[in-house]
Amino acid sequence: GTVKCPKGISVKKTSSQSGDIIRERYTFMNTTDKDIFTSLKDISIYTPFNDDYTCGAKACMTTKCHTHIWCGENISYVMCLRMGGEAPHLGLVLTEGSLSGYSVERDFEKISNDRGDFILHPSPVALVPNESFTIEWKLFWHNGKDDFYSKVNQLCNRFINVSAENFVLFSGENIN
């Protein structure tokens, strides 16, 4: 996707495919003679997942998706699920680097029917001259939530899936 970054940082994007897995790699380098410090939204990688409702209910069921994004630094993923529930679905798992957040760029004239473009943001970094860092992820097909987590565990050895019956507890409640 499109990448935006501050002046003085260059980006080199490469991609490759092995079977049904697509690997995308973004290497960012400080090309100045001064240190550069980034904040969360200084670097943006656009990931235009098709999460909108602009084509009518019937078409949305097969051609659009719900996009679930977890930016958990070095354990980050995107799980896209077709609105109709029928596989295949698209997944993305981070395999190198760190993502600390995401934002959405949308056309407000379309109101809530277009969720917009999702923009993933690498974690803030401090780069000395000629220093670089890399963001790499793998894109893959999956058959639903259970298959997604199974494939993520195969594709990324650092992935940890945390789940709980309830993520908000009140005093005296048990954690299951």
Spell out what each predicted region is.
Residues 4-6, 18, 42-46, 50, ...:
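Beta-strand-rich recognition/accessory modules
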Residues 3-13, 17-68:
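Acidic (Asp/Glu-rich), glycine- and aromatic
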Residues 165-173:
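Short, solvent-exposed loop/linker segments at the N-terminal edge
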Residues 33-35, 142, 167-168:
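Short, exposed beta-strand "edge-strand" segments with a Pro/Gly-rich flavor and a Y/T-containing core
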